[in-house]
C-alpha cells in the first residue's frame, strides 16, 4: 500500500488530519469514505430546481472563539458575516430563541426590565430545587420555571427524543440559556459566518493536495485486513462498528429530511424556524436561501425548504446525536478499553468518540491529535500511542 497513513472518514476531523499530515509532514495519505462525497455531514449541494445551496444533512453554522481553529479554517475559505438567529412558533405566535428579554415580554404579555424578568423567572424556577431534579422536566423547570419550560422545552423535547421528558436524564439539559437583554444571536462566539463558496468548496480545498488520495464509496471494512498492521490508521467511523458491536450497539438519534420546493420567493423569512407545539410532527423548518442573502442569483419566485423529523436511529440510519444513556456509557467504556489495545489505530471525530461535536470542535480535536500524537510519531520518531480515543 502506497500510503503512510490511512484516514477513515472524509468529514472535518478526517480531512484536517489528512491535510496537516500531507502539507506539514509530506506524508502520503489515503482517505476512505463510504459516501459518494467528502465533507461528512457538512456536505452541501445546489438544489437541482432552484440552484439554492442546501445543507444536505441539516443546518451547519460555523462559529468558534478558538483562535487556532479560526486561523486554520481561514486558510481554505472566506466567511460571510452571517449571524445565526432562530425563531420558534408556539400557538400561532413567533418568539425569538434562545429565550431572551423579547421572548419573555412577548410570552407574558407585558414589558419588563431585565431585573423584573430575572426576578420573575427565579421565582418560577424556585418551584423545584435543581440539585434534587430526578429527570429532564424537573431540571428544566428548575432552570427557567414551569411556564417557559412548558411553552418552549417540553413539546420540542418530546418530539426530539420521542420520550416523555419525565423519563429523560436531567443531564441532557445541564443548562438552558436565558438572556435578560434583547440579544437574539444564537451563538456567542467571537467568530461566526458561513463559507462564501459553500461547505463543499471549502472541504475540497482541504483535500486538494497531490499527497492526498480520496477514495469515495469505499468501505474501510472491506479492506481492513490489508490495512491494519501495515499502516497507521485514524478512524472516524462508529467506534462500536469497528469492534463488530461486540459490546452492543451504541444508541443514536437520527433525522429524516423532507425537502420541498415552494413557488414563493420567501417561505418563512428566516433560515431556521422551530415548532414547539406537540401536534406539529416536525421539529423545525430550514429555508437555506437565508443562509446567503448576499447571493443575488437565487430565484425570486421559488425557494426550497427542509422539514426535520427526529427519531431513534435504526440499523442503516445515519447517526446524528448520541443518546448517551447509562447503558450506552457502560458500552462506551468497554469500547475505549478495546481501543487502547488496538495497535497503531487512533479514534476520533463524532462517531469515533461517541460525542456530539460542532464543526469547530471536530477541527480543534483533529489539530490536537496531529500535534500531540501524529507529528511526534512521523516527524520525531516517537512511538505512536497504541489505540485510544481522542477526547
Labelled PLM ranges:
Residues 16:
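Short alpha-helical segment within the catalytic ATP-binding CA
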